[in-house]
């Protein structure tokens, strides 16, 4: 299963939950921000040298470090294969 850290800029995907290694407080905060099962997320841009990426979800944009984004599991967005076209 893909994770959010693997989503290329411009691509969309549906959130399918969190990996088992995520700390409970991090998962709780991500859910508060809109990273909830079924929501569609889009990678807006990435910072150079492996820095944080900016993701749009629930009408807002958030920067997440790669090690946090790696815990957000993804499936294809409805009508989308998750790949930029």
Question: What does each model-found stretch correspond to?
Answer:
Residues 23-29:
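Short alpha-helix capping/helix-loop boundary micro-motifs
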Residues 11, 47-50, 54-85:
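C-terminal structural segments of small proteins and small subunits
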Residues 16, 34, 54-57:
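Short, acidic/hydrophobic/Gly-rich beta-strand patch recurrent on exposed beta strands
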């Amino acid at each position: 299963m893909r994770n959010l850290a693997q989503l290329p800029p411009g691509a969309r995907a549906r959130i399918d939950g969190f990996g088992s290694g995520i700390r409970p407080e991090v998962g709780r905060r991500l859910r508060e921000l809109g990273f909830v099962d079924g929501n569609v997320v889009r990678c807006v841009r990435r910072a150079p040298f492996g820095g944080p990426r900016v993701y749009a979800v629930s009408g807002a944009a958030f920067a997440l470090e790669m090690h946090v984004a790696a815990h957000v599991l993804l499936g294809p967005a409805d009508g989308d294969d998750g790949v930029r076209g």
